[in-house]
Regions:
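Amphipathic alpha-helical substructures
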Residues: 171-191
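Catalytic cores of eukaryotic secretory-pathway lumenal/extracellular enzymes that build
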Residues: 1-2, 6-154, 160-162, 168-172
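P-loop NTPase catalytic cores that bind/hydrolyze ATP
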Residues: 158-161, 187-189
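Single conserved hydrophobic/aromatic residue that forms the stacking wall/gate
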Residues: 193-202
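Mature extracellular catalytic domain of secreted serine hydrolases
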Residues: 134, 149, 187, 191-193
Length: 202
């Protein structure tokens, strides 16, 4: 299971128990999974790469090698956000060990035919995508084009770092106006600690 950014393996703590021990959560033993939740290179517990070239494809190759070294002949991969990109690359590389992938942020565009004669439902979806591109994706542009400018600013200001990340929790969780409706304060602070570490490495 691969996380995204801003994110960390902390995001998975509520699903690990039910997946690895379903009996303890009113499930059946046959539904149990082994879960491997690595931190992306340079995030959380993973060291910052010392060489260039650590893009999505390289991480996908390394994740497959990790699974082999851990003794898994077959596995499934799941990812969200950047984890979706890594997981998609695992599937596309088709190295033989991965039996299937699941992504919760698929990278797919609308079919050209749908754009030529969009339905009302298509228009609602396209309007939402445009709104996100215009008003919700600024963080991505900043992080992808000027990461060090942002990194120096955030590492120098704990309040700036907290505000930058908490705004994402506000926008991206179904929190009904307050992130603590979804995550308690300890969970938010633990996430903030894991998410802040890569900023210091920028």
């Amino acid at each position: 299971v691969t996380h995204g950014w801003p994110g960390s393996i902390v995001e998975f703590h509520k699903v690990i128990g039910p997946l690895v021990d379903p009996v303890a959560h009113d499930g059946v033993a046959q539904d149990a999974f082994d879960l491997i939740c690595p931190s992306l290179p340079g995030y959380g517990f993973s060291a910052k790469p010392t060489a260039t070239g650590w893009g999505v494809e390289k991480i996908a190759t390394v994740w497959n090698e990790l699974m082999i070294r851990l003794g898994y002949e077959r596995y499934f991969a799941q990812g969200g956000d950047w984890g979706s990109a890594v997981t998609t690359a695992i599937g596309l590389q088709n190295l033989g060990q991965c039996a299937g992938i699941h992504v919760n942020m698929p990278n797919a565009g609308a079919p050209k035919e749908a754009l030529l004669n969009p339905t009302e439902r298509d228009m609602v979806a396209l309007s939402g995508a445009k709104y996100y591109a215009d008003w919700g994706a600024g963080y991505s542009k900043q992080q992808s084009t000027r990461p060090q400018t942002l990194g120096y600013g955030l590492v120098d200001s704990p309040m700036g770092q907290a505000t930058w990340i908490m705004e994402k929790f506000y926008e991206w969780t179904d929190c009904n106006g307050h992130p603590e409706n979804v995550l308690n304060r300890d969970e938010l602070l633990l996430s903030l600690i894991h998410i802040s570490e890569p900023t210091r490495r920028t």
